[in-house]
Amino acid sequence: MKKAILVLAGLGLALTALAQGPFTCTTEGAKLRYMTTDAKGNETSTSTVDITKVISSGDIFKITQVVQLYINGTAFTKPIETVATVKDGDVVVDFGGGLALAAEGAGFILPKRMAVGLELPTGEVTVDVQGMKVKQDITFHKVVDKEELTVPAGTYECYVVERQYSAKMLGIKVNGSMKTWYARGIGAVRTDTYDKKGKLSSSQILTEVVIP
């Protein structure tokens, strides 16, 4: 169960400047580091997102991201690879075709033109990570706020996106919600995860951005 929850957190990361740039990092060789804490603020794991390849053609970018999860400094899973396509500033993340991951269902979309009140796509996705299938049904997906957020990596202007979901992992059904703060040129700056009662269960915070 713990592994499945960490995998979901890693997928959230893979969903990541210019004033009107996309809500993801487009610099090849960049590395984003995150820390995950429990509800009391105690560190439980860390993770990295490496931008390993960026291919551009006109206004279209294909960005390969590799996510690695760590517990006590030791890799917890094999790397998770995703490919994000940026077209006209909109970010579409395809969870299929990765090093340790395959998926069925709709991709994840972050539009260039964010606005409070904007409703984002919902739907179902089934992810197979190293033989472990995680089925997630997103039932609510909306931009709920815009605010400046300070994290260890810096201060960012962010849009806050709330997502409510029902997930099935290892035969166990989990209902919950997430709030993610997205910044242009970075992607996810912070993600708070809540249980079905709305109680905070974990936070994932950007601690460092390394640009080559």
Q: What name fits each language-model region?
A:
Residues 1-4:
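Positively charged n-region of N-terminal signal peptides that target proteins for export
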Residues 10-11:
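Short, linear, compositionally biased motifs with a strong N-terminal bias
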Residues 20-80, 129-212:
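Acidic, serine/threonine-rich low-complexity disordered tracts
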Residues 25-27, 85-156:
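Solvent-exposed helix/loop surface patches that form functional interfaces
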